[in-house]
């Protein structure tokens, strides 16, 4: 009678405290044979991961007199389901070391964990244990082997495990399909896909996504059209493919046709417009959204920040805080907002962010730290920037580049060079931004030879100098009075020189009152810019500086005749070269 009552209560244990109360009755009345049911019920009804429950179950398992594979398997599966992959493997090893034979659930779960860990674990020993315990006839174990070997890149072993499955299900087929796709064998993956007897959404999405990532939107679109039931994820994959190919018109066509848009759909489109610099279209979509969540605000703020509209980014951030008390910015939001303030040179905002983080318990990650470093360096608060940089958990290309760029803007060549040397010693690969900062530092410090060495070393790091890098070199040579050398460098450029490059030569011509190169540079700027007022004004000043008053007057008259609005500033004066 008591046995039946305890079984009744065991079936209804849904929280830890209830489980403990029933467990106490089991121990007192020596009904230990019911403990496996307790373990199962406790883990089964726990929807969210709980460290207390795991500790409690482990204590029960350690106290078992008999070898209960079922209960150990429940714990292994629970940990795997909650993405505690390392602990899943550790518990499985404990079970094995205790001499307890694994259940099919335990093997399936640990195989999944092995493939999901950051440093994937070779599953061959587990495969051997499954064979020894006669579990390789289980379709779930066999499918788990296919999945693990696929992720490890052992595609032949995955294929063999797949062939051994007597009754293949859709999950088995998808595991093999995923394996070929992960190995980059798209043609073989397509053959597998075509053989799948009952394709599900995962099958379709895997193959469509692979074609989209490759940029083969013809095949991706054809498969999408053939897909019988399209999920929101399927639509997003196709839209994302067109976005990555910069085909925003086609992306917008499918977006507009999508029956049920979700947050990912809107964010994908806004991000696509962001990359193309089409802020107006991004704004239009943003306004169309009836209910905006934090991620959508993040996308739009990032759009403004990345496209040189920092004031709009800050205005939207303020609106987000005012209108949506339920939305709290996190490190991603704040990183974009800090970058916007960095463009405005407002270092005081960094102090506000640090206070906000402390007040709201937000974790300051390396992304946000790097944005703050960039803000402080550009604002001249070097002590704060260097302190924050030294406290980073992991220094990477982006954080080093932010520091070096800050040094470059402020002419700190020694510091920039030291950072670059440390970066190379730690085998952290530099990028084009790194060299922009380093070259700027050498340019501001007049270190021409070092600048040349740096410029020529870009190819050693598999980087091709861009027009911006050539522009900085022209600026550096121009500052040093080596105008002819700067002109020859421009003529040697593998790409078409832009107005920024010619503008650097024009400015240098003004510094040294050189009419010849000033005229050459200005003529190119006039051809390249729709409003060349600033360039013409500067040429007029060069004429005036050498006493050629008539020529200066002629240039100024031409500005008036063309009804150009005279503005003394122009892009190359406000850009990164100065």
Curated annotation (Swiss-Prot):
It comes from Arabidopsis thaliana. It comes from the Eukaryota. Signal peptide: none annotated. PPR repeats lie at residues 68-102, 103-137, 138-168, 169-203, 204-230, 231-261, 262-292, 293-327, 330-364, 365-395, 396-430, 431-465, 466-496. NCBIfam families: PPR. Gene3D superfamilies: Tetratricopeptide repeat domain. Keywords: Repeat. The lineage of its organism: Eukaryota, Viridiplantae, Streptophyta, Embryophyta, Tracheophyta. Coiled coil: none annotated. The keyword Repeat applies. Belongs to the PPR family. PCMP-E subfamily. This is Pentatricopeptide repeat-containing protein At4g22760. Residues 501-576 are annotated as: Type E motif. InterPro entries: E_motif, Pentatricopeptide_rpt, PPR_At4g14850-like_plant, TPR-like_helical_dom_sf. The gene is PCMP-E6. The keyword Repeat applies. GO terms for molecular function: RNA binding. GO terms for biological process: RNA modification. SUPFAM superfamilies: TPR-like.
């Amino acid at each position: 009678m008591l046995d039946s009552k305890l079984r009744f209560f065991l079936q209804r244990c849904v929280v830890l405290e209830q489980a403990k109360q029933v467990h106490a009755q089991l121990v007192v009345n020596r009904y230990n044979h019911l403990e496996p049911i307790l373990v199962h019920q406790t883990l089964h009804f726990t929807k969210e991961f709980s460290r207390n429950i795991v500790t409690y179950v482990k204590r029960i398992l350690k106290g078992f007199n008999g070898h209960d594979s079922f209960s150990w398997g429940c714990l292994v599966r629970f940990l795997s389901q909650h993405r505690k992959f390392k602990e899943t493997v550790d518990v499985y090893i404990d079970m094995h070391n205790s001499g307890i034979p694994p259940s099919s659930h335990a093997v399936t779960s640990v195989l999944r964990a092995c493939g999901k860990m950051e440093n994937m674990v070779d599953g061959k020993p587990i495969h051997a244990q499954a064979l020894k315990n006669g579990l390789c006839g289980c379709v779930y174990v066999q499918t788990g082997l296919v999945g693990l070997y696929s992720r490890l890149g052992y595609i032949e072993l995955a294929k063999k495990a797949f062939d051994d499955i007597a009754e293949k299900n859709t999950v088995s087929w998808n595991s093999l399909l995923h394996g070929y796709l992960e190995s980059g064998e798209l043609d073989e993956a397509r053959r597998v896909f075509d053989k799948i007897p009952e394709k599900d959404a995962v099958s379709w999405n895997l193959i469509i996504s692979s074609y989209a990532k490759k940029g083969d939107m013809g095949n991706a679109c054809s498969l999408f059209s053939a897909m019988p039931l399209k999920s929101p994820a399927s639509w997003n994959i196709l839209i994302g493919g067109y976005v990555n190919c910069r085909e925003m018109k086609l992306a917008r066509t499918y977006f507009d046709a999508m029956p049920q848009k979700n947050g990912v759909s809107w964010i994908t489109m806004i991000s696509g417009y962001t990359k193309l610099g089409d802020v107006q279209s991004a704004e239009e979509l943003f306004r169309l959204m009836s209910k905006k969540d934090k991620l959508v605000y993040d996308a739009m703020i990032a759009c403004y920040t990345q496209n040189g509209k920092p004031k709009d980014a800050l205005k939207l951030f303020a609106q987000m805080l005012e209108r949506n008390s339920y939305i709290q910015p996190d490190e991603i939001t704040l990183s974009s907002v800090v970058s916007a303030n960095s463009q405005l040179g407002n270092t005081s905002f960094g102090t506000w962010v640090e206070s906000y983080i402390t007040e709201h318990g937000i974790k300051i990650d390396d992304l946000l730290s790097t944005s703050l470093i960039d803000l402080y360096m550009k604002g001249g608060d070097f002590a704060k920037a260097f302190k924050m940089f030294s406290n980073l958990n992991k220094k990477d290309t982006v954080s080093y580049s932010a520091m070096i760029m800050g040094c470059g803007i402020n002419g700190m060549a020694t510091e920039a060079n030291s950072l670059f040397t440390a970066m190379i010693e730690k085998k952290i690969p530099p990028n084009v931004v790194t060299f922009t900062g380093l070259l700027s530092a050498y340019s501001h410090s007049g270190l021409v030879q070092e600048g040349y060495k740096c410029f020529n070393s870009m190819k050693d790091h598999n980087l091709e100098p861009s027009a911006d890098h050539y522009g900085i070199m022209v600026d550096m040579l121009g500052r040093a009075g080596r105008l002819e050398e700067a002109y020859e460098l421009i003529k040697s450029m593998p790409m078409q020189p832009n107005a920024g490059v010619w503008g650097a030569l024009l400015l240098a011509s003004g510094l040294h009152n050189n009419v010849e190169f000033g005229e050459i540079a200005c003529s190119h700027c006039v051809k390249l810019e729709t409003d060349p007022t600033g360039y013409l004004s500067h040429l007029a000043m060069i004429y005036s500086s050498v006493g050629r008053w008539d020529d200066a007057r002629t240039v100024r008259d031409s500005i008036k005749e063309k009804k150009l609005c005279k503005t003394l500033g122009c892009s190359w004066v406000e850009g990164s070269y100065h």
